[in-house]
Amino acid sequence: MTGPLQRRAIADGVWFSRIHDPKFYHNSISVTIITPLAEGKTSAAVLAAYLLRMGSRRCRDMTELECRLADLYGAVLDTDVSRHGENQLLTFSIAGADDRFALEGESISRGCAELLGEILLEPKVEGDAFPEEAFRLEQQYLIDTIEAEINDKRSYAAQRCTAEMGRGCRFALPRYGTVQETLSATPKEAYDRYRELIRTARIEIFFSGCGSPDYAEEVFTKLFDGVERAPLCPTPQRLPLRAERVTELAEQLPMSQSKLVLGFRTGLPQQRRVRTALRVMTALLGGSTGSRLFTNVRERLGCCYYCGARVNLLTGILLIECGLEEANRERLQSAILAEIADLAAGHITPQELSHIKLAFQSSLCSIGDSLARTEGWYLSGLLQGDPITPQQDMEEIASITAEEVAAAAAALTLDTVFFLQAVGKEDGCDED
């Protein structure tokens, strides 16, 4: 990338960001609706996002929508639903060739911005509700998606541990909602939730690529100029900093290997440098094939099939996820805790710290290879409140000391142990 993020408000609670990178031959425009996860409203928001991607008042079906995309030199439209800390994110994006490749001098970026804005703000409706037939199709698709989550046993175990640690907190709510919530939703409720989000949610718009964002900014400024906005400013929930006791939970499922998840509180550091040290410590502990958990616990002790660590800086939760034979459970858990204690004691060699920093450097250098990853990087930074460039992050990581890594490990407190016991292989299923 040639420069950092340039961002300005174009409406109340609506922000337009520019990221210029001349090495690409195309541009990406994304609109992310950011709203706190809310029990009873999550599924309706997802259904609304799925229905918006089906067309608009001027594109009454997928055939017409595909024709519009074809006229824009094969532009690609995408929709994504995700969770970031306490927030639900609904992202709509379009990618198209740069204007200089237009055969008749037209602006492809303007056309892409107009189509994306049309899909977002001029949905296809019947009266004051989404079309019944389209709603039922998307409702069943969402139910199937939610019910299929348990098929990924590793992800399911991590979600169960996180939900227990976040009991009573917004971040513990499922990103898609529940089957019951989805079944009880109606086309009108989904449309009402959509209108509520357009009025109250924080909205981040990105234009990234080689071209000029001026047309896109003009389009969205005019569009939101006609939208009634009353953005909400939710108060962040107070999250636990340390574990008061260890909660142990267990479930059984038909599968070929058991899963063990250890959930730790990290102290929820607020200073960026302390958070960076926590990231480095997590990577050193279990973030790569050169980490302690992989080298010592998996390879040397041989007491698990996999063992890795990841941290969520917004919730202050670090998870260690393992696949194992049940007979190795106690030995595995003891070995993991011993590795954390060893890091906390400061037993960190310059060589292993250097290797982890090089791994970070490689990963951060690759962010600029994709416009989607670049936008995701800056959006994540905005949600954390301190966006920096990947280069700035590399420089800070390079300066982290072994003492800072040890302090991050010493701040960990074990909160929850979730064990998913294998009770026989499920027919036709291989979750490993």
Label each PLM-derived region with a short phrase.
Residues E66, E122-I146, P234-R242, A338, ...:
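Acidic/histidine-enriched alpha-helical segments
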Residues S17-I19, Y25-A45, M62-E118, R154-G177, ...:
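M16 family metallopeptidases and their MPP-like homologs
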Residues G55-R58, R100-L103, E122-P131:
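Short, polar/flexible loop-turn hinges at active-site or ligand-entry regions and domain interfaces
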Residues L142-I150, C161, M165:
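Glycine-rich, mobile lid/loop segments that gate access to catalytic sites or pores
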Residues M1-A75, E104, T178, Y191-N296, ...:
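His/Glu-rich zincin catalytic helix
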Residues V125, N151, R199:
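Catalytic domains that recognize anionic headgroups
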Residues S82-H84, Y191-I198, G308-N312, A406-A410:
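Short, flexible, solvent-exposed loop/turn segments with mixed acidic/basic and small polar residues
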Residues S184-D192:
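Active-site glycine-rich loop that binds ribose-phosphate moieties when present
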